[in-house]
Amino acid sequence: MNKQSWLLNLSLLKTHPAFRAVFLARFISIVSLGLLGVAVPVQIQMMTHSTWQVGLSVTLTGGAMFVGLMVGGVLADRYERKKVILLARGTCGIGFIGLCLNALLPEPSLLAIYLLGLWDGFFASLGVTALLAATPALVGRENLMQAGAITMLTVRLGSVISPMIGGLLLATGGVAWNYGLAAAGTFITLLPLLSLPALPPPPQPREHPLKSLLAGFRFLLASPLVGGIALLGGLLTMASAVRVLYPALADNWQMSAAQIGFLYAAIPLGAAIGALTSGKLAHSVRPGLLMLLSTLGAFLAISLFGLMPMWILGVVCLALFGWLSAVSSLLQYTMLQTQTPEAMLGRINGLWTAQNVTGDAIGAALLGGLGAMMTPVASASASGFGLLIIGVLLLLVLVELRRFRQTPPQVTASDS
């Protein structure tokens, strides 16, 4: 009898050509967006010498992403999903070309950067929602956990590589190179995506887009299972906003500039380990309970993080948070895809991703407010323990999620 390994199985990339194409396109896209993420704040800072102006660009892009996720969810449930993905990627690339041309001007326009940031934020998130909605059809619902873990690794790897490349390009060629290569990378992603099969949405009655979006909201609120998953995801994202306290906590621990980097690397490293060791997660009989417990553990790790007497112990707490949050996120992703009707996948994925974006912004704002009234240590601990208390209450209240059981997929020779 074959025994399921703890390690992530990458065989999905070999057996499912469509998922392999998405994997390749996603990795190139993450690297391209990383080049953009380095260039935009640097260019605005050089032009204005104002951190407020840099923050404004991030806020505007985030707002456009939120709207794009909402619109993308409706479009993904009404139109052929492959066309939505290709349209979003191509249109996003046009925005990158605009940023490149603007950077080459003798006096680049700040307004153009803001407007193109809105453009790219909207269309980038539009494609994300359609791709999420199409994933079950590409890999089969029984392989969603494996696909989610591979995707998480892709995101983490790309997020590490792209800032390094972006920094080197800034040092050697300036921001125009970053924008130009980001545009080239985005158009290159169209090549593997063109090989995807047609991804039509399920047949459903035509209705006004706002009414369609409201139907998604109603489903989310009416379903204790799916609604509970989305709520946990938002709270977990709020906890990850603890990174806004890193500089202040680094002063408290008397860390050097080089050591501060370990704080920023700890959560992604823990999450990567969580994805790599997720081989048995799909075989959990009670994924809802495991999701709740891993989320509680993540909140506890954040609660203890700021209380550590040495920075290295704080890094361990952050890595533990990254690992537990990866476990919870993979379970959230898989259960959301399997428990949502096919006709609702676009809207529910859009709402789930949007609440993750919103949760991060709310968490950062709350921690900033606490930081004005408390010490950094007290702020980190108070936020963590507050979320832990809410998590315990949800463990008691979300009865359907806690008691949810599933039949584990059969282990085959190729899975072991």
Curated annotation (Swiss-Prot):
Any one of the GO CC terms: plasma membrane
Gene3D superfamilies: MFS general substrate transporter like domains
Identification of the protein by name: Enterobactin exporter EntS
Annotated transmembrane regions: 22-42, 56-76, 84-104, 110-130, 157-177, 179-199, 219-239, 257-277, 288-307, 314-336, 357-377, 379-399
This protein's encoding gene: entS
Matching InterPro entries: Enterobactin_exp_EntS, MFS_dom, MFS_trans_sf, TM_effector
Main subcellular location of this protein, as a coarse class: membrane
Protein's membrane topology: Multi-pass membrane protein
Keyword Cell membrane attributed: yes
Family label: Belongs to the major facilitator superfamily. EntS (TC 2.A.1.38) family.
Protein's cellular compartments: Cell inner membrane
Protein source organism: Escherichia coli O1:K1 / APEC
